[in-house]
Curated annotation (Swiss-Prot):
Disulfide bonds join C52-C94, C83-C128, C87-C130. The gene is VEGFA. Residues 1-26 form the signal peptide. GO terms for molecular function: chemoattractant activity; growth factor activity; heparin binding; vascular endothelial growth factor receptor binding. Widely expressed. Abundantly and equally expressed in heart and liver. In kidney glomeruli, brain and yolk sac, isoform VEGF-166 is 5- to 10-times more abundant than isoform VEGF-190. This is Vascular endothelial growth factor A.
Length: 216
């Protein structure tokens, strides 16, 4: 019984869809009913009709429900009021500022398994406006951040104290690895200590900073 009711519901939905399609084909396009084949459309009318506004647009259901790939929808697209059109500046784009949801009955089919009429919600636009494009806005924000950063860096550089640089002569040209040099005083000291040399039964030569055999 339920199966029969589903098919009746399906048949009625298909009939209504076909009738509406025939009516839409027969009805003249908005503003085109009295137009002559070679008539030139005036600038003001072209401008008004092409400017940013809400207009009925056929939207693919999979565009709105990308995760429901296991289903087939009938119809596969739905008429929705969406923002479209041109703005007076290339840096602006037509975007929705007021939106609302509309519920539609859609035939939802799972091949070889089930089919039913489902209530599906879609977003419609009720008001549009020309706003700065995202990429332009991001570039402006980056520029302002860069400008602030540069100013701060300059201030830091100006306020930073640079101590005078000292250049010390090397303690030894050949045996640099044996010496440790203080960069501020340029004083040289031996890397190895006397106790280390004595542990090897040697003596520290403070001039060469090497562990040598004791003199007798």
């Amino acid at each position: 019984m339920n199966f029969l009711l589903t098919w009746i519901h399906w048949g009625l939905a298909a009939l209504l869809y076909l009738q509406s399609a025939e009516l839409s084909k027969a009805a003249p396009a908005l503003g085109d009913g009295e137009r002559k084949p070679n008539e030139v459309i005036k600038f003001l009318e072209v401008y008004e009709r092409s400017f940013c506004r809400t207009i009925e647009t056929l939207v693919d259901i999979f565009q709105e429900y990308p995760d429901e790939v296991e289903y087939i929808f009938r119809p596969s697209c739905v008429p929705l009021m969406r923002c479209a059109g041109c703005c007076g500046d290339e840096g602006l784009e037509c975007v929705p500022v007021d939106v609302y949801n509309v519920t539609m009955e859609i035939a939802r089919i799972k091949p070889h398994q089930s089919q039913h009429i489902a209530h599906m919600s879609f977003l419609q636009h009720s008001k549009c406006d020309c706003r700065p494009k995202k990429d332009v806005k991001n570039k402006q924000e980056k520029k302002s951040k860069r400008g602030k950063g540069k100013g701060q860096k300059r201030k830091r550089k100006k306020g930073r104290y640079k101590p005078p640089s000292f250049h010390c002569e090397p303690c030894s040209e050949r045996r640099k690895h044996l010496f440790v040099q203080d960069p501020q005083t340029c004083k040289c000291s031996c890397k190895f200590t006397d106790s280390r040399c004595k542990s090897r039964q040697l003596e520290l030569n403070e001039r060469t900073c090497r562990c040598e055999k004791p003199r007798r």
